[in-house]
Amino acid sequence: MSLIVSDRFRIVVGLGKSGMSLVRFLANRGVSFAVADTRENPPELATLRRDYPQVEVRCGELDVDFLCRADELYVSPGLALATPALQQAHARGAKLSGDIELFARYAKAPVIAITGSNAKSTVTTLVGEMAAAAGKRVAVGGNLGTPALDLLSDDVELYVMELSSFQLETTDQLNAEVATVLNISEDHMDRYSGLPAYHLAKHRIFRGARQVVVNRQDALSRPLIGEGLPCWTFGLNKPDFHGFGLREENGEKFLAFQFENLMPVSELKVRGAHNQANALAALALGHAVGLPFDAMLSSLREFTGLEHRCQWLRERNGVDYYNDSKATNVGAALAAIEGLGSDIGGKLVLIAGGDGKGADFSGLRAPVAKYCRAAVLLGRDAELIAQALGDAVPLIRVDTVQAAAERSAELAQRGDAVLLSPACASLDMFKNYEERGRVFAQAVECLS
């Protein structure tokens, strides 16, 4: 029997990737629904009109009276729940929901649920590869890649889901087999009233979870859990009885579980302490669902990282170049600066700037002073970053990513690394962080 009551009317609000997945899901179940989007020409409009010409669609300013016709509004993550039209419809009886809530109702296989301010995609991808190496029929997606509803299949044995705070806002009960908040730092402060509201949204991932994984070194990642709920931990310190961490023997560091060394850190192909933390988090999540260590460690040895996430580009004149364009918040940039900075013999030349989304950049000052030779700044909020850094290092302003690559190459010395880790979104200058990363990679390739 369908878990959706068929005589109720629904509206999908937002026609991007997740909105279109909702359209397919509802249409396949014969549910009555319409579509609304604040944009005059949303990305999937042509697809909707071609494949579902019978579905009513309203584009432009949201019509409250139209929304109030619905018993339930499936709100895409790109639209804030605080939008007045949504709040008015909700006050008049419409339930606000989303695609992840529907996914949770229909998923028959265990779910590994992953969120955090940073490293979500890397850890999600790693766990998915570990599960595949263990012979599991695994589906990976959510905020990363394939929308959640498009993954639903009776053939799937395990779901590995990356979830954003925006998706979790409309998720009442996820019921994951294991859930984690990898870390929390300020992000999306242009959408949330402050860090507490952002923290609460992230922690909705733990609702109904059967096990949790906690970052020992980030108190904000730890949920309030009842007695008896299994809790596994990870961190860059020595592991506890239920934990994964680092051990050192004869000058060599090892990934470890409890009192057992699992593999030398030197066997990882990805560099930096932050990537060691990602590996430990993935091990903890995989262990929670019973993945064997041999398959997980084999996956770790082969993993080369994701594009735009502290991605090594090339070496030139003794200087390594890294593309960390995905670092769209301060926490992500800090992870890269500290992770790479502690792992190289020289200094970093940092390239940062863009749309800061209302963030506080003051946390960058100390690690930049410790690990960086200079900072090259660009984008809308370059001056805000400059004010936060003060006299920590020499500051250079440029107008383009190409100029940033050229100036950084001039500043870097043999043994250094040039790191694009903007601590900002890209929308002031680019379509998305991927385009920013590609432009940087091309500029680095063109250095004479």
UniProtKB/Swiss-Prot annotation:
Subcellular location per the Swiss-Prot or TrEMBL entry: Cytoplasm
GO BP: cell division; cell wall organization; peptidoglycan biosynthetic process; regulation of cell shape
Alphabetized UniProt keyword annotations: ATP-binding, Cell cycle, Cell division, Cell shape, Cell wall biogenesis/degradation, Cytoplasm, Ligase, Nucleotide-binding, Peptidoglycan synthesis
Pfam families noted in UniProt: Mur_ligase_C, Mur_ligase_M, MurD-like_N
Binding site for ATP: G116, S117, N118, A119, K120, S121, T122
Pathway: Cell wall biogenesis; peptidoglycan biosynthesis
One Gene Ontology molecular-function label: ATP binding
Function: Cell wall formation. Catalyzes the addition of glutamate to the nucleotide precursor UDP-N-acetylmuramoyl-L-alanine (UMA).
HAMAP family the UniProt entry points to: MurD (MF_00639)
Protein name: UDP-N-acetylmuramoylalanine--D-glutamate ligase
Organism in which the protein naturally occurs: Pseudomonas syringae pv. tomato (strain ATCC BAA-871 / DC3000)
